[in-house]
Amino acid sequence: NPTVNSVQRDYMAGEISKDLTQRVLLRQEIVDAHNEGLIHFHDSDCFAQHMHNCDLVNLEDMLQNGTVISETMIEKPHSFFTACNVTTQIVAQVASNQYGGQSVNIKHLGKYLRKSKEKFAKQLEDEFGDTLDQAAKDKIVQMRLHDELKSGVQTIQYQINTLMTTNGQSPFVTLFLHIDENDEYVEETVQIIMEILRQRIEGTKNEKGVYVTPAFPKLVYVLDENNCLKGGKYDYVTKLAAQCSAKRMYPDYISAKKMRENYEGNVFSCMGCRSFLSPWKDENGEYKWEGRFNQGVVSINLPQIGILAKGNEEKFWKLLDERLELCYEALMCRHKALEGVVSDVSPIHWQYGAIARLKKGETIDKYLHNGYSTMSLGYIGLYEMTYLMKGCSQTVEPGKEFALRVMDYMKDRCAKWKEETGIAFSLYGTPAETLCYRFARIDREKYGDISNVTDKGYYTNSYHVDVREKIDAFTKFKIESCLLYTSDAA
């Protein structure tokens, strides 16, 4: 809401940061490429600050070992409600010191739900001893636990939507809902997930007292063998999730089976809305996901290459090479801007557990190399590019084959950069809510109305089939599924 003071101030700060970025911090070649729509240097309004993009918050470490928020020590919680309250405070602090989204795994709250249950049981034992039979005690414990469960989840839902970050927004946070039967607290996790879904179905009241769908937290629910509606133990949870999606559009869904195929047997959350990490192992050979992050994104304008190539493949590949090199240089600017940054720029991230536990004054450099964090190459307009080069979309040949070749080529280029630098470059289905229009507007101004390309006022995001294509949903999914696996970053 641009009439609100905090939002106005953030807009003004962002414009100053953009100006500094273009006049002082970036090479003129990259600035020109951005302004002319060859590439897009994402989030330049935050580039003057030493910020990274998105991450998976190491909530387990922060709750178990404590953290510090605004120079105040927060010790290990002893109840579910307190753990929920601390979680929302962590989320707000993290969001204020990065520009991308964050995700937390809700299973880390399971331990604290059990602590509350044990606390209630002890209270009853101390208060009533043998004067109450065990069945009565169990019933009272469950009643008290249900009240605390409801209050804790309500705290998360309402505080995330009412706490403001420094830019006047609600924190962009995703709750990862995974029923992992290898987890000691799986039954507690199931109870928490059920309550999250029930409260999301109900919604939150707006200023007029009407129940509406809250924007955050985003919910991501994992479908696995134990809950995929094929007789699994937790199918009932998935049925509630489906009811929730039908009414509130969330949760989104992740296939554990497909994730294990794609990520060396692992299942983990995206960082915020869509960005996924690459596999990385620590010194003990253990996979690590939480406490990792994305350094930043640069996107390439594919339709503009198609416009200039005019169906000539030799010219197309030459232009693609040149512009991918521009993207690489722009991404390395992001990387180098983070090198040498000290942990003091964001204590919640670098000193108190969200990502690391570095000392004051220590640089974050070791987390920028060797694949620990990622760099993302985004792309816009595979549909329009294919139409310009082959006269058809990626839904039919020869468009489909050409689109796959381009995707594979960009992915291979990311792999080459990774091998040369040790930085985890990967291909990214771009967050292009406005970029789809920006690129199309620039190209329309430069090249005029081109039928089925610039004349419609937008470019199609990443690998997707254009929304105007006369195609049923399942055929669309099938075609896109051949392309999305190349987009391993998002």
Feature names for model-found ranges:
Residues 2-371, 388, 392, 396-490:
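Conserved catalytic cores of very large enzyme subunits
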Residues 371-385:
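Conserved phosphate/anionic-ligand binding catalytic regions in large, soluble enzymes, centered on
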